[in-house]
């Protein structure tokens, strides 16, 4: 699984047996449909060639005869001139697709249909940066909007380290959200500096900004968040203040805080929500769509993120570390997926490396007689299998790398502080 590949929401198609290669009856077949058939048949022929190579000559001759019949059916199909709209075909389903760019809007009609990027005249698409202090519910909100758990969520602050891209697509729009690390003013490590760089680069690519605040806490101006995240408290980007966790306070308190934020902040609008239960999320979508420009979808409509599967595997392990260990241990850990091998006839093999800064931290991760690391591996494996919808063999190693949070070159290697390349 290579970096830069986008993860699809759909499950991979089932493998077809050799007997399934007989062409179905074709009462009506257009040139575009024939083109799709040739693509599918060529792939299946390569797959069958591997299977038949170890079989008998009779089996091989039968397959060659089937191929000739298939080619004759294709040639016959070229003669049909029926309208494409009248043809019922099965769209090829790809498991992975390369990250698209702005040239998607220049694709021809057939290719746009195959990628699911065809759009109506009023189609809207754009980027949204989600900012806020640590532990205010940014990741929970994005998971609700996207409809799938992409960002890990714990009750500890600064759980999100990387800039997570989530994609919410419908026929009329595509919202691309950046989940950013919590905005912090005092940067303790080089890692903190790199994470804040991620925040600023996300805003630089955005069409609008959501600032999430905790309704349970005393009202505060968002100038500091905009200053640290945007670089300018008087940004010209549309800003929505999201008052999260309204389910934890009384209705009368919500009204007072709404009035305060509307009076003392520069936000264009204020919307109270409960990201945990999804209350108010539709209102946020409506506000975002009112700010996004008209344009085609930047990504295929059936993907939820541009990150590869191995990225989310590492995030799942890191989430379990946050949930299982306390104090400084989760913050001292860096999780790297160093090997990911897909095996069609066996469990996928995944090898994960956990880096810590001290030998004492390594001992805590391992636990007495290795009990703690076994518990971590089991919890991680179960969630990974649920995410991938397949069985995996997970191997976890724990190593000591002193002061890795202060090593800028190492942090860049781990994906921190990279600039966003907006499509």
UniProtKB/Swiss-Prot annotation:
Pfam families, alphabetized: KH_2 (PF07650), MMR_HSR1 (PF01926)
Entry keyword annotation includes Cell cycle: no
Query: Which GO terms of type biological process are on file?
Result: ribosomal small subunit assembly; ribosome biogenesis; rRNA processing
Xref: InterPro entries: G_ERA_dom, GTP-bd, GTPase_Era-like, KH_dom-like_a/b, KH_dom_type_2, KH_sf_prok-type, P-loop_NTPase, Small_GTP-bd
Give me the ranges of the annotated region G3.
179-182
Q: Family assignment?
A: Belongs to the TRAFAC class TrmE-Era-EngA-EngB-Septin-like GTPase superfamily. Era GTPase family.
- Region (G4) location: 244-247
The superkingdom of the source organism is Eukaryota
Span of chain positions assigned to the transit peptide in the UniProt entry = 1-60
Domain Era-type G span(s) in chain numbering:
124-294
**MF (Gene Ontology):** GTP binding; mRNA binding; ribosomal small subunit binding; rRNA binding
Question: What organism is recorded for this protein?
Answer: Oryza sativa subsp. japonica (Rice)
Q: What is this protein called?
A: GTPase ERA-like, chloroplastic
Q: Which CDD domains match?
A: Era (cd04163), KH-II_Era (cd22534)
Keyword set includes GTP-binding: yes
